[in-house]
């Protein structure tokens, strides 16, 4: 798994993808930081974190679009699938590579917290709790998009489908309120990512929210392993 992880991580920095994702994330987080903290003279990062929820849904598909689709396009997937490394290790190696880049993106919020501390007293407990929520959210979305990437050999298709899925997640909270059928509304609310993420932005650390994101992550990684397993024996 270590070799897969190192290969994946170096691949991000040997291409433009890693730099583009970092640049876009830093740009929007910096923009929101200026608008909601400096411009409004506020010590709270809550609105910054809240708005980054929507940005994450669209940059992660770009980050993960090449994980398996590029392997299929270049016909290197068969060598990977027949290697002595287990399919689970392959999937985890690629997942951790993408998550490391995402973690570097999220680390900028620690810098923002330090900057605020020069002028006011930031609520570090809320900042760290929300940062944990953003990392858990990223884990789930990365796992989902890696699964999407395993289904196609086109990076563009993987990115577009991933963004479409992100758009559905972004609008699910609003859509669930418009559904007249109560049991459907209940289900939509229970799978609404924003509901679970919002609790973190209030500094509320709930085991239910943590389990939700970890479960989604594990489920999509499991699905990805099953896709690769079927391809190995086909």
What residues fall within each predicted segment?
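Transmembrane helix boundary and interhelical loop/hinge segments in multi-pass membrane proteins
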Residues: 44-48, 63-81, 95
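Secretory targeting signals
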Residues: 30-34, 40, 45-51, 55, ...
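Alpha-helix N-cap/helix-start motif at helix boundaries, enriched for small hydrophobics
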Residues: 88-92
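Hydrophobic/aromatic residues in alpha-helical transmembrane segments
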Residues: 60-64, 112, 143-144, 223-224
